[in-house]
Amino acid sequence: MFDPETLRTFISVAETGSFSKAAERLCKTTATISYRIKLLEENTGVGLFFRTTRSVSLTAAGSHLLSQAKDWLAWLDSMPDELRQVNDGVERQVNIVVNNLLYSPQAVASLLSWLNARYPFTQFHFSRQIYMGVWDSLLYEGFSLAIGVTGTEPLANTFMLDPLGSVQWRFLMSADHPLAHVSGPLTEAQLRRFPAINIEDSARTLTKRVAWRLPGQKEIIVPDMETKIAAHLAGVGIGFVPQPLCQTLIDKNELVSCTIPTMRPPSPLSLAWHKFGGGKAVEDIVKLFTQRQPEIAGFLSIFNTVRCEKSSHFANWRVK
């Protein structure tokens, strides 16, 4: 009923509004075009066109068919290439989860551009998660690969890991915060008087981690690192921030870095993927990271000894 030639004929008639013009476009006779449309209407049991002596126009059913027919035809035309890709061991879909600390729109776009050029028929799905939420996606939600799982050892022996680096932290507050000019290491009693600004762990199944908060201390949860830094600048609270994201603000005396009794150790992050069942696209992504290719450099900038500057409204953080 919906063979490629019939779909092309229907689309041409709908677009030209004429059997004769569709015949010219398809290098067929008008009688052939008219017969195909008549047969299609008989097989579907509905009228697809209103006919006048000079033109034809779509019925409601015809409009609905047109909205679907182009997608069907494109799918049929691409199917041979898709089948060859699957036969060559290329995944039909690859789900990639990225740690919030490593996430960058530009980094994702760079990797997507590289992947899309090589695997045009693979569906790529990116997700942004926080702390143990990255492992959660890999363990329980069908994700193929994770950029920035916590630690350097897998949570299950079915995964492979490649250490990417360690995030260095600074304990921060605004320059006009009451604790900013206290001499010497701050005590827990002093710290507890002010809210801890944190980003909530996005784990759904695994146990959530709390970045830093003292017993009895008020906690304020924000959705991302940009908001967290903005809250520090506004004097709302205190807490740890990755050094590359705050060093310029420290140098400008907009933020103050202090020492507290228990400093946060560096956080090692790794690339993680399934040992078994992966295809060529995942293999190529792993190679990009293990070989530290430029296509993935944007994900690793937080590990470098670089400084970042704040753009307006704290919307983006540009590595210089």
Swiss-Prot record:
SUPFAM superfamilies xref list = Periplasmic binding protein-like II, Winged helix' DNA-binding domain
* HTH lysR-type domain location: 2-59
Pfam families from the xrefs? HTH_1, LysR_substrate
Superkingdom field: Bacteria
GO MF, one term, reads: DNA binding
| Keywords linked to the UniProt accession | Activator, DNA-binding, Transcription, Transcription regulation
Record field: transmembrane: none
Residue ranges flagged as DNA-binding region: 19-38
This molecule's function is given as:
Positive regulator essential for the expression of allD operon. Binds to the allD promoter.
Instruction: Give the similarity note.
Output: Belongs to the LysR transcriptional regulatory family.
Q: What is this protein called?
A: HTH-type transcriptional activator AllS
**What organism does this protein naturally occur in?**
Salmonella choleraesuis (strain SC-B67)
